[in-house]
């Protein structure tokens, strides 16, 4: 069984693989729009596929995008999953981190992350990354190894 994950546009590519490839069993997208689901543009609006997302997906968001998902048209597919009834679509908001704070760049170059995200993270980067790593591992364990039922953390 194959799981794929990525951050930002890499996560968009992972989401596309989950839709296109039959050998992908689960996808984790770290603050990534469903770009592959955009079928075209009609009167200035994105036209999205109506096909349900075919595999379990965990979407992880930072403060950078969480409050703007419904405003940003490239995130229309994400909003549909947030408000839909897909039984294996999970959405996790990690408060206190910015877009690059979802990556290990926060450990190797905290100053660069602070500059790129526009502010100092309100959450400790190590704590935030530990939460992301543990959640992603439990998600893949559940959907790739059939080790229990996945549940989001209670109070991230």
Predicted feature residues:
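Divalent metal-coordination and catalytic microenvironments
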Residues: 2, 91, 140
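Gly/Ala-rich beta-loop-alpha elbow adjacent to hydrolase catalytic centers
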Residues: 5-10, 14
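Active-site-proximal flexible loops/turns
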Residues: 15, 38, 103-106
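Active-site signature of alpha/beta-hydrolase-fold catalytic machinery across serine-
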Residues: 16-20
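Residue-level recognition of short, well-ordered coil/turn positions
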Residues: 22-23, 148
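The feature captures the conserved acid-bearing segment of alpha/beta-hydrolase catalytic domains
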Residues: 25-99
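Alpha/beta-hydrolase-fold serine-hydrolase catalytic core, especially in secreted/extracellular enzymes
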Residues: 96-156
């Amino acid at each position: 069984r194959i799981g794929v994950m990525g951050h930002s546009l890499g996560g968009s590519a992972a989401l596309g693989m989950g839709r296109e490839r039959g050998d992908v069993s689960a996808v984790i997208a770290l603050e990534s729009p469903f770009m592959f689901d955009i079928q075209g543009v009609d009167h200035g609006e994105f036209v999205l596929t109506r096909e349900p997302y075919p595999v379990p997906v965990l979407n992880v968001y930072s403060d950078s995008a969480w409050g703007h998902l419904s405003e940003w048209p490239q995130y229309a597919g994400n909003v549909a999953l947030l408000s839909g009834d897909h039984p294996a679509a999970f959405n996790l908001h990690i408060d206190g981190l910015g877009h690059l704070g979802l990556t290990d760049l926060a450990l190797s170059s905290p100053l660069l992350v602070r500059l790129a995200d526009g502010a100092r993270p309100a959450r400790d980067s190590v704590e935030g990354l530990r939460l992301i790593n543990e959640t992603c591992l439990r998600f893949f364990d559940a959907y790739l190894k059939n080790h229990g039922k996945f549940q989001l953390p209670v109070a991230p």
